């Protein structure tokens, strides 16, 4: 897909004949808040609109540093990408009737970072009145990669500017932002991953510029908001795939490679737990290895490989998704939960990677 800063468009599909008062489904794509587009063939909404007699909407939103640069000042207040989504939801409320949709029957849904985005709109006072239902696939705002503390976000924005060469006054963030505005978008894209410490914990699931608790759109830590019952109290659908972790493991975890069967032994398995979760102490590593070992199938050479899939996928994708479902149930709402386990027949990845993220 060609890259352009002129990207803030949305797509609308309506069934034929044109409906009146139809349900509206608004899709938010994933991609770690640094990649993605609504124009992928897999996101073509015409089939869903036709088969289910609904109006389907998707939108683009700014990504990476261009969408989530944060300085704590008006020069770069953060979460521009989420505000793009918010603006699209406002547009739906104001215009969807012209396409046969009912602004009172809007469901927002998304996958991965798109699911976290859906959850942020459920939490944000700015967005709660712009939809009625929500579906989240393979993530939520409770994922450890989905939101960053404001000070870390500020430091990463500073590091990006300095890495590009905007170091005239490191303490004046507005000056740094003004300098960044003078460089090309491609230059910013080329440098934004340099702010990630590859030796840090969770680097496989780290994102250089995720959403930030800005005090405006994201007013509090998502976990604290759920604990306090401060969220849009609605029925939801949440789900995940059977093999959430495998997609990530082939990007550097010892023993894993898309060109092999990635068979590992117990020693490698334990070492990979440390590799994926380096902040765990020795006791927790051993307990994790014990918990995820399939003791009834010790004779299967794929057992440790499959176990590490869950060791990585559970904390980053499955558990945060389930936690949101449980929170809504605890508040008397209904949460529908699914696991997607079907492996695509035309999967371009090795079959052992399964139904992956």
Swiss-Prot record:
Domain of life (superkingdom): Eukaryota
Source species, please? Branchiostoma lanceolatum (Common lancelet)
Q: Which UniProt keywords apply?
A: Disulfide bond, Hydrolase, Serine esterase
Q: Which residues form the active site?
A: 112 (acyl-ester intermediate), 244 (charge relay system), 357 (charge relay system)
**Entry-linked Pfam families:** COesterase
Q: Identify a single GO molecular function assigned to this protein.
A: acetylcholinesterase activity
Which Gene Ontology cellular-component terms appear in the entry? extracellular space; plasma membrane
* This protein's record includes keyword Hydrolase: yes
Q: What is its EC number?
A: 3.1.1.8
Q: Which reaction(s) does its UniProt entry say it catalyses?
A: an acylcholine + H2O = a carboxylate + choline + H(+)
Task: Give the protein's recorded name.
Answer: Cholinesterase 1
Give GO BP annotations, semicolon-separated.
acetylcholine catabolic process; choline metabolic process
Q: List the disulfide bonds.
A: 166-179
